[in-house]
Swiss-Prot record:
Residues 661-713 are annotated as: Disordered. Residues 661-673 have a biased composition (Low complexity). The gene is sbcC. GO terms for molecular function: ATP binding; ATP hydrolysis activity; endonuclease activity; exonuclease activity. Belongs to the SMC family. SbcC subfamily. This is Nuclease SbcCD subunit C. Keywords: ATP-binding, Coiled coil, DNA recombination, DNA replication, Endonuclease, Exonuclease, Hydrolase, Nuclease, Nucleotide-binding. The keyword Nucleotide-binding applies. It comes from the Bacteria. Pfam families: AAA_23 (PF13476), SbcC_Walker_B (PF13558). It comes from Rhodobacter capsulatus (strain ATCC BAA-309 / NBRC 16581 / SB1003). InterPro entries: P-loop_NTPase, Rad50/SbcC_AAA. One of its GO terms (biological process) is DNA recombination.
């Protein structure tokens, strides 16, 4: 980063606004420049302004204690480290601004501002305002104190401390290296190079080690807190689960039988319900079929009306066309009449428009000469008005200027009078305060002595309070020590009692554990598992036998149903063959009979004559049967054919039903065979399971004897025997567990007491140390009190003469400092007022003389301008009087435009009237043509309408239907016939389907009744089944609870296994951290910090030696033991010397080399293009000064610009470019940039 400019106002002694621009000559081309001035002139204030603008702090504010207070002009005290303390006394506002280039290459402006309330000198200090903006567009990036500091640090890459050691090397910051001892040098090195990070790392390593140790101890404590079930308890739980599982299995077969019986009852009841429902459905379908008579009649009428739709539509359309033609003829006649009237009106309007156009044209020509004269006068009047307005404006401006000048003259005269009065008042006030002038002159020292006296009094009171507090703490610590000793004695007695109780429990536990080892419980659990397997094998065999019997019954029933279905299928096929044969036999005769009864045959028979050949077959004989007998024969043949078709359809339905029943029966038979096979397989598996498990059970020592084949009685006896053994073992294990629990609790209580005893001892030791410390504090407090009292008495003695002159006798009197300050302030105010009045009078004299001359000149100019304005107004009025009679005073252009508009409007009206007349003539001709055409169309439509009505009447007569009936049928919604037809078909199909369903349901009911129902009623069966299921549910809950207890124990065991892994991992991690802690860790962080500081000091010495080679080649720095520094004297054979043995000039050069090295190391890789050194060069001789300047100038080749603050004249003479700070009196200073070209 690079500093581009520094600006400010009212920063300490720099009262006037100032700006130092490093981008313009001569500073822009100067690699080295000096900031010069007398001591106290304000050289360092420039650097304060730079730091305030960038970071809101300044080096001089950080030097003192932040708890110190300083008085403010507003009557309050502020911290000595408050940045507002930089604000100049007597100033209402002050600011500092820095323009700099950031790491990104862009330019930014940082600003700091302090102000007082209401911008008054006596106002209360307000909160500091800070801002950061981008220079190129003025965009504000931050406007809050913390945000500005963070943004500046991000843009420059430097924190405030890094800025102070990289860009600004303030007074005393680097010479402290040579003055400090090893401990102080470590602190300074950590401060200026940022190696405090390593101290933090060392502390973190120590804390992490302690955390790992605590985590390891916590895991060990967690492992000791868990309690597990022993093997006997787990075996007992397993036995109870097996017993309840066996009982559940035994009840399963009975539940299956009861469920099957209830299912048979439900199937019979369902079959009866379905027969009843099918009968009800058939009755409902037949009733709906009977109700459809009116619908059938309506459908017949709709079918007869269908051919009449077209004639009806044609007649309606003809009537509509006739109505439309008549309406068109009437409208055409009316239009012809209206067109004739419009033609007459348009002819009259055309005549009137022609007359008006002639009249307006003549009037327009008559006004021509008048308009020309009026236009000439209008131009002259406009020119005269402009000239008159300009003259009036000039007169008003000169009058206002003269009045302003006269007011300024009066203001200066009044100011002169006020300044004279102020000078007289100040002189009188100084005369009144002449006796207090010495007090004002000695006030700074007197104020410091008073402050020191107050501080001594406060220190004495604080020391006395501290001594009393130490005595009170000593008494409290003694009482706490006595209480701790009593608690320790109680815990020791309790620990002895617990040790005796633990020994007694151990004696009672030993014989029980010997008689009931954990292996016994495990053996019983294994026997229980084996018996459970035998129980499952026995249950599986029983269930397989039951399933096999059921499958055999199902197979027999399926075979019977299949045989019956095949017989029904054969009979249905025979019926279908007979019906189809009968249909085929009746088809030919019926077709011949229909042909004989047709209209064509009847017409041909009427043309036959005896002896003439038949035109069809050529026969000469023509027997003619009676038509009535022939019709009767055809009707009988048609009825027989319909009956045959019905029989064929019934046979097809029966065939389909028989085939479905046969397929269903065959599927049931296949499923029954598969069920028999699975039952056989399951029975064989059950016998094999019994055979595999029984030898293993018999081989166990505690197991009862069992036969080689499944035997329910023997198995039940074995389970009873096992239950008794497990009950006895569970009781013994419960007693062992209780004793172990009591023993563990006793050990836990003893451990708690041991920790308490350790805590008691630690408390006693801590209290002893605190008592010693408290006694020491009391002695120190008494010593401080004595010292403060002596300092107070000495200051009171020193203050006595000055207080006596001021009429005061007690330096600790309330309000003394305020009274003395008020007197001193009054003297200072009077002196300041006198000086200000004299300065004001000197400045006002030439201003007042010039104001009087300006007033006379302005008055003469105003009078001349007023006369010119009056002349111009007269000329303008004469022209207006000449123009007023013409055109009634109206503007010429407006009057001419109005008459021209009237002429043009008359011409347009004449043209429009002619066009309207032509349009009306054409409209009349078109209306007459339309009237003739519509009359012809109406005649033709009437003829067509009569023909359509005649066709419709003939069609209605042929269909035996009236026009009203046809209209009602046609008005029905579209699709009515189809809906009626579909509804009737659905009713007929519903009756057929209901009859078929009723027959099927009756067949199903008969089959179920043939199988027979259980003897026991459904209510009794349901009650028995509910009791069995409730018992099974209870056993399932008990099994679940017991299983959950086993699962919890297993989970605890698994958790403990994981805890062991965690404990081992924690131990390994603790070992690692202990090794790291041994290397670099420490509670205070010193271990690693010293290592880092030693390395950093080596690098710092290396950088410093490079600069020292240019500044003073005789010496070379080196690090001695730990962090101490020595110099090697090359002129003395590289002899090592202490830094304190260096002369003043040599010491400064070494300090300067260290400062430059620190500036290289302090920026975390950020290059600082500007460097300020605030350190005196007065200790250097001419040669050393030249070397120092040459070394600083070489930094320009590295891209740096170096500024040196110094009041040494030799330094100023050797540096051409300077920022000179000069005192101006009254605590004010000003600055100026000096150099080549300025």
């Amino acid at each position: 980063m690079r500093i581009l400019s520094i600006s400010g106002q009212n920063i300490a002694s720099l009262a006037a606004p100032f700006r130092i621009d490093f981008t313009t000559a001569p500073l822009a081309g100067a690699g080295l420049f000096a900031i010069t001035g007398e001591t106290g002139a304000g050289k360092s204030s420039i650097l304060d302004a730079m730091c305030l603008a960038l970071y809101g702090d300044a080096p001089r504010l950080s030097a003192g204690a932040r708890s110190d207070k300083v008085p403010d002009a507003a009557g309050e005290e502020i911290s000595a480290a408050d940045s507002r303390a930089i604000l100049r006394r007597g100033a209402a506002t002050g600011w500092a601004e820095v323009r700099f280039a950031g790491r990104d290459g862009l330019e930014y402006i940082a600003r700091w501002q302090a102000r007082r309330a209401r911008d008054k000198v006596e106002g209360k200090l307000q909160t500091v305002a800070r801002s950061l903006a981008r220079a190129e567009d003025g965009q504000v990036l931050a406007a809050q104190t913390q945000a500005v500091s963070e943004q500046v640090a991000a843009l420059t890459g430097l924190s405030y401390e890094e800025f102070r050691r990289t860009v600004l090397l303030a007074q005393g910051d680097f010479d402290a290296f040579l003055r400090a001892d090893t401990g102080e040098r470590a602190t300074l090195l950590e401060k200026v190079t940022g190696t405090g990070l390593y101290r933090a790392v060392s502390i973190r390593v120590y804390e992490r080690t302690e955390m790992a140790r605590a985590e390891h101890a916590q895991l060990l404590a967690r492992a000791a807190e868990h309690r597990l079930l022993d093997d006997a308890a787990r075996a007992a739980l397993t036995e109870e689960i097996a017993a309840r599982t066996a009982a559940t299995a035994a009840a399963t077969a009975e539940r299956a039988g009861l469920s099957e019986a209830l299912a048979r009852h439900r199937r019979h009841a369902e079959a009866v319900r379905q027969v009843q429902a099918a009968a009800a459905a058939l009755a409902g379908a037949e009733a709906l079929q009977a109700e459809a008579g009116p619908a059938r009649a309506q459908l017949d009428r709709l079918e007869r009306a269908a051919p009449l739709h077209l004639p009806w539509q044609a007649a309606a359309e003809a009537r509509a066309r006739l109505d439309a033609a008549r309406s068109g003829a009437e409208a055409a006649a009316a239009s012809r009449s209206l067109a004739a009237q419009a033609l007459a009106t348009r002819a009259d309007a055309a005549a009137r428009a022609t007359a008006a156009g002639t009249e307006t044209e003549e009037a327009f020509k008559a006004f021509g000469r008048i308009w020309d004269r009026a236009a000439a006068l209008d131009a002259q009047i406009a020119t005269a008005a402009t000239e008159a307005e300009a003259a009036r404006t000039r007169a008003a401006e000169t009058a206002r200027a003269a009045a302003g000048i006269r007011r300024a003259e009066a203001d200066l005269a009044a100011a002169e009078t006020r300044a004279q009065q102020a000078r007289q008042a100040a002189e009188a006030r100084l005369a009144e305060l002449a006796a207090q002038a010495p007090l004002a002159d000695d006030w700074p020292q007197l104020r410091r002595d008073l402050a020191d006296h107050r501080a001594a009094c406060a220190a004495q009171a604080a020391a006395a309070t501290a001594a009393q507090a130490a005595q009170d703490r000593a008494q409290a610590l003694a009482q706490e020590a006595r209480a701790a000793a009593a608690a320790e004695a109680r815990d020791q007695a309790a620990d002895s009692a617990l040790a005796k109780a633990a020994a007694a429990l151990q004696q009672a536990l030993a014989p029980l554990e010997a008689a009931h080892p954990p292996a016994r419980t495990a053996d019983l659990a294994r026997i229980e598992t084996d018996l459970a397997e035998l129980t499952r094998a026995l249950r599986d065999g029983a269930e397989a036998a039951a399933l096999g019997a059921a499958a055999q019954r199902a197979a027999t029933a399926a075979a019977t149903e299949a045989a019956l279905a095949r017989a029904q299928e054969s009979a249905a096929k025979q019926d279908l063959d007979r019906a189809e044969t009968q249909i085929a036999a009746l088809t030919a005769p019926l077709e011949q009979a229909d042909l004989a009864l047709s209209d064509a045959a009847r017409s041909l028979r009427a043309q036959l004559s005896a002896g003439s050949p038949c035109p069809v077959c050529g026969a000469l004989e023509h027997p003619t049967p009676a038509e009535a007998g022939l019709a009767h024969l055809a009707e009988r043949l048609r009825a027989d054919q319909a009956a045959a078709r019905g029989a064929a359809q019934a046979a097809r339905d029966a065939l389909t039903a028989a085939q479905g029943a046969r397929a269903t029966a065959e599927a049931r038979g296949t499923q029954a065979a598969e069920d028999q096979r699975r039952a056989q397989t399951r029975a064989e598996a059950a016998r094999a399971a019994w055979g595999d498990t029984q030898p293993r059970v018999s081989a166990r020592p505690l197991a009862p004897a069992l036969p080689g084949t499944p035997d329910p009685t023997a198995l039940a006896a074995a389970q009873d025997r096992l239950c008794a053994l497990q009950t006895a073992e569970a009781a013994a294990q419960a007693e062992i567990s209780a004793l172990r629990t009591r023993l563990t609790e006793a050990e836990r209580d003893r451990e708690r007491l041991r920790r308490a005893l350790l805590a008691h001892r630690g408390t006693r030791e801590r209290l002893a140390v605190q008592q010693a410390e408290t006694a020491q504090e009391a002695a120190l407090a008494e010593a401080r009190r004595t010292e403060a009292a002596a300092r107070r008495d000495g200051l009171a003695l020193a203050l006595a003469p000055a207080l006596a002159r001021a009429g005061e006798d007690d330096p600790a009197a309330p309000g003394l400092a305020e009274r003395l300050a008020a007197t001193v302030s009054a003297v200072g105010a009077a002196r300041t007022g006198l000086q200000a009045a004299q300065e004001a009078l000197s400045a006002l004299a030439p201003q007042l003389a010039a104001a009087r001359r300006d007033s006379e000149t302005a008055t003469a100019q105003a009078q001349s301008a007023a006369q010119a304005a009056r002349d111009r107004d007269g000329a303008w009025a004469a022209l207006r009087a000449e123009r007023a009679p013409l055109l009634d005073g109206q503007p010429t252009a407006l009057h001419r435009s109005r008459f021209n508009d009237q002429r043009l409007a008359a011409q347009r009206a004449q043209q429009a009237a002619a066009a309207d007349l032509a349009t009306a003539q054409a409209a009349l001709a078109a209306a007459e043509a339309r009237a003739a055409e519509t009359a012809r169309a109406a005649s033709e439509a009437a003829t067509a309408q009569r023909a359509a009505e005649a066709d419709l009447a003939a069609a209605l007569e042929a269909a035996a239907m009236s026009a009203a009936e046809l209209a009602a049928l046609i008005a029905l919604p579209p699709g009515t016939a189809e809906r009626l037809r579909a509804d009737l078909r659905g009713r007929d199909d519903a009756v057929t389907a209901a009859r078929s369903a009723l027959g099927a349901r009756k067949t199903d009911l008969q089959e179920i009744e043939d199988q027979g129902n259980p003897a026991e009623d459904p209510e009794a069966l349901s009650a028995r089944l509910a009791a069995l299921e409730a018992e099974a549910e209870r056993r399932a809950q008990e099994i679940g609870q017991l299983s959950a207890e086993l699962a919890r124990d297993a989970a605890t065991r698994a958790a403990l296994a994981g805890l062991a892994v965690e404990t081992e991992a924690a131990r390994a991690e603790l070992e690692v951290w202990e090794a790291v802690n041994k290397a670099i860790g420490a509670r205070s962080g010193d271990r690693f910090a010293r290592i880092a500081q030693a390395i950093t000091l080596d690098v710092l010495v290396e950088h410093a030696n490079r600069h020292l080679a240019d500044l003073n080649p005789r010496y070379r720095l080196r690090r001695a033991a730990e962090l101490s520094l020595q110099v090697e004297d090359r002129d003395m054979g590289d002899t090592a010397r202490a830094t304190r043995s260096l002369s003043g000039g040599e010491r400064f050069l070494v300090s300067l080399a260290l400062a430059l090295a620190l500036s290289q190391m302090g920026g975390k890789g950020t290059f600082a293009g500007t460097l300020f050194i605030d350190e005196g060069f007065g200790a250097l001789d001419a040669g050393s000064l030249d070397l120092a300047i040459d070394a600083l100038e070489t930094l320009q080749s590295q891209g740096r610009q170096v500024g040196v603050i110094s009041h040494v004249e030799a330094m100023q003479a050797r540096i051409a470019t300077r920022i000179a700070v000069r005192k101006e009196g009254g605590g004010r200073s000003s600055l100026r940039v000096e150099g080549p070209g300025v």
